[in-house]
């Protein structure tokens, strides 16, 4: 495939990933992907001598016979009868629109109050409470499950005795109305200031709208699943009952915490839209990098070439540079080198995979070919190399990890990672564009890691983190592209690359290759050697079999079967021996919990 098509496909792919990622990230508020959510949450918070909270939850149940409990829990001690000498919430009453549901309260101790005369219902609720270790919860239970989809309403009334920070100038209360809850589609909170006690009000998340009204304040918004909802207030001293503790400079700490929250929130919101823009524009960015560092000159090369484009090019270099992704070397390069050394009279491939060493003068060989010959000579006996001997050595070295690792490294050097591969690649390719892609990948990963560890005050923080993951995925796709796509071939090597591709196409076409005469053995030998280097040696062998060129076919089959087995054996033994082992501001409020269902 020519690189023009490759870059278009890559850009289209990362664009699709970006659009889908943004859609899933920004639309996932829980309501579209759940069988129940809270359509309307309305609360009246009375700021009088006591802090009184009235709540109405309107559940929309989308799937019948799945839920049997609608509840409101607290992350604060809940009492039904009596009082505590620490901050707590007291239940005054509860009601529901459904006659089929039974109310219950589970206090902070686990004591259960069921508003039914039926003993079996009480036992059922007790079993559920024990099973889920329920505490600090008030709600309604339907023993026959909620059968029909529809709207179901529950309401509660509480008196809250919160922790209060004071410096004798201000009272500070931070009330968390929810933090782990179903999605709230519509939120409306009326803060009713009965005695004009509120001096300042701070609402979390900052995306909620706050209106000043004749009775106090109205707060409106929408809350995704588990998004915190908090109301923080500065009040006149001695205006509300609660549990006070002295804190120096209450006003300063409150305002400082809120400013910090809004500052971070604004940064995160800006980062959200910036990431969305980068994600959507990233295909264009990738294309610009390609134009700057990867776009090649146009060459006219036929689709098929029946001759070896460059016979002076060593088979292992053809495998490393032209067979696929430049810089990726595989065992076919090693096998092609063995066939080439056999053809040039340095070795003789024998039955059973053995190799007879015919020449020991390595002066005319390059570095990689010398490494191959040195390996064969080092582990040969009487100038005959036997792959079975390498297998036996691997078994022998099981108890000596250092010797086994040395053997594996020697084998890897000739079958996977030739020396000086990077220098060879740099001789053919200018890789600055690919380095930019790798740098972008590293930056995207560091950003995602940073965002993972910062506190998640609201859904927006989660969205930014998920968007960073989308950006990482886009960069991974680019990083996995061939080196040559964002690199530029030096000199006229791109033309040679196209010629090797055309030659590979020819060798892959059985009908075309079989047209050539079997008498010209030298041509078939070249085709087998370079076809192996290009990864299509099996196609050449298939044609040879049909033309009865059995001798050449035998060499290919012997090498593959015996040396595949040798490499696998060493890797397997090595793997078995190494193994593997094994307050103030947002989030600081009193209360928590929220509306749920089970």
Swiss-Prot record:
GO cellular component, one term: plasma membrane
UniProt keyword terms in alphabetical order: Cell membrane, Membrane, Transmembrane, Transmembrane helix
Compartment annotation: Cell membrane
The keyword Oxidoreductase is annotated on this UniProt entry: no
Residue stretches spanning the membrane: 7-27, 274-294, 435-455, 467-487
Main location per the UniProt record: membrane
Protein name, entry field: Uncharacterized protein MJ1577
Organism: Methanocaldococcus jannaschii (strain ATCC 43067 / DSM 2661 / JAL-1 / JCM 10045 / NBRC 100440)
């Amino acid at each position: 495939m020519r690189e023009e098509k490759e870059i278009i496909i890559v850009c289209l792919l990362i664009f699709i990933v970006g659009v889908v990622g943004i859609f899933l990230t920004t639309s996932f508020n829980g309501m579209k992907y759940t069988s129940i959510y809270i359509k309307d949450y309305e609360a009246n918070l009375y700021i009088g001598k006591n802090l009184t909270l009235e709540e109405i939850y309107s559940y929309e149940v989308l799937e019948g016979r799945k839920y049997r409990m609608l509840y409101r829990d607290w992350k604060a001690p809940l009492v039904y009868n009596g009082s505590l000498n620490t901050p707590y919430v007291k239940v005054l009453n509860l009601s529901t629109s459904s006659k089929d549901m039974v109310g219950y309260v589970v206090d902070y101790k686990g004591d259960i109050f069921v508003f039914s005369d039926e003993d079996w219902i009480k036992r059922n609720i007790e079993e559920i409470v024990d099973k889920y270790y329920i505490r600090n919860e008030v709600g309604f239970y339907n023993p026959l499950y909620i059968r029909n989809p529809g709207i179901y309403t529950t309401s509660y009334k509480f008196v809250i005795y919160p922790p209060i920070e004071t410096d004798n100038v201000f009272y500070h209360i931070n009330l968390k109305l929810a933090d782990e809850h179903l999605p709230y589609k519509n939120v409306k909170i009326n803060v009713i200031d009965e005695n004009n006690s509120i001096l300042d009000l701070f609402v979390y998340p900052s995306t909620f709208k706050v209106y000043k009204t004749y009775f106090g304040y109205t707060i409106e918004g929408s809350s995704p699943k588990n998004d915190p909802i908090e109301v923080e207030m500065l009040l006149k001293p001695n205006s509300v009952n609660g549990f006070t503790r002295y804190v120096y400079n209450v006003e300063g700490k409150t305002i400082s915490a809120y400013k910090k929250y809004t500052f971070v929130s604004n940064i995160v919101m800006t980062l959200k839209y910036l990431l969305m823009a980068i994600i959507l524009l990233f295909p264009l960015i990738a294309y610009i990098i390609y134009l700057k560092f990867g776009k090649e000159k146009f060459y006219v090369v036929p689709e098929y070439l029946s001759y070896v484009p460059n016979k002076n090019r060593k088979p292992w270099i053809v495998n490393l540079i032209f067979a696929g992704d430049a810089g990726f070397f595989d065992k076919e390069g090693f096998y092609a080198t063995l066939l080439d050394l056999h053809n040039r009279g340095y070795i003789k491939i024998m039955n059973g995979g053995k190799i007879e060493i015919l020449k020991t003068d390595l002066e005319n060989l390059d570095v990689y070919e010398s490494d191959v010959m040195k390996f064969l000579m080092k582990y040969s006996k009487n100038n005959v190399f036997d792959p079975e001997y390498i297998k036996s050595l691997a078994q022998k070295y099981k108890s000596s990890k250092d010797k086994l690792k040395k053997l594996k490294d020697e084998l890897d050097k000739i079958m996977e990672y030739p020396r000086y591969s990077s220098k060879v690649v740099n001789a053919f390719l200018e890789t600055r564009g690919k380095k930019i892609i790798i740098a972008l990948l590293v930056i995207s990963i560091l950003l995602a890691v940073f965002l993972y560890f910062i506190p998640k005050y609201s859904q927006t923080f989660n969205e930014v983190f998920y968007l960073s993951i989308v950006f990482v995925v886009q960069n991974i796709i680019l990083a996995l592209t061939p080196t040559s796509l964002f690199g530029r071939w030096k000199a006229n090597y791109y033309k040679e690359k196209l010629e090797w591709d055309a030659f590979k196409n020819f060798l892959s076409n059985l009908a075309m290759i079989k047209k050539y005469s079997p008498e010209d053995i030298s041509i078939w030998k070249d085709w087998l050697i370079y076809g192996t280097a290009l990864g299509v040696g099996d196609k050449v062998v298939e044609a040879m079999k049909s033309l009865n060129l059995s001798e050449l076919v035998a060499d290919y089959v012997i090498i593959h079967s015996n040396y595949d087995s040798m490499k696998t054996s060493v890797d397997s033994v090595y793997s078995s021996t190494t193994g593997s082992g094994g307050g103030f501001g947002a989030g600081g409020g009193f209360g928590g919990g929220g509306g749920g269902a089970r």
